[in-house]
Amino acid sequence: MNLIRNEFMKTNQVIKSLIFVLACVIAARFLLPANWTPILALALFMPYVTSNKSIQVLMPISILLLTDIFLGFYGQTMFFVYATLILIAFISRHQSIGSLLSLMKHSVGSILIWHIVVNFGVYLNGHDGSSLAQTYLLAIPFDLRLMGSTAFFSLIFYSAWATKEHFRSSIEKA
């Protein structure tokens, strides 16, 4: 009986994950403005969701890949985008789980990493003669929107997680 229950729970978790991936792809493609995406917040939040380190990296990467399939691919800069997302997913493992302050610090830090690495890739692949400083400067408005969305979605994910944890502890006490 426990084997059946465990298999059902695993299947249920996979279905929930697929629905979440689909919802993020649809939101990023059809509902949200440019540079307003849950992808970085998800990469930061995955350690709250699962201890499986592969899933922590593969979930945000799969959402980004599916979104890129719909939106279109964008050349060699993609390497920097995907590498940065993987780096952020690895760094997120070192935050204090359960701490909103830690999550927000990692949100800001991830945007700084994103700004430095991805825009360096834009500079390397650019053909308009812009300087590196100019590339970083021109990216600030886009990255500020990305910071706003990362903080916003991190708060939403954290609120949902904290609510679930509150109800779980209430049920366990009863």
Predicted segments, located by residue:
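Hydrophobic alpha-helical transmembrane segments
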Residues: 15-20, 54-58, 79-83, 104-108, ...
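Central hydrophobic cores of alpha-helical transmembrane segments
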Residues: 21-22, 56-67, 103-112, 174
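Interfacial aromatic-anchored transmembrane helix boundaries in multi-pass membrane proteins
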Residues: 26-37, 61-94
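Structural signal for the C-terminal ends of transmembrane alpha-helices
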Residues: 27, 46-54, 90-99, 159-168
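Non-cytosolic membrane-interface motifs at loop->transmembrane helix junctions
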Residues: 43, 75-80, 133-142
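Small-residue-rich segments of transmembrane alpha-helices in multi-pass membrane proteins
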Residues: 47-52, 73, 109-117
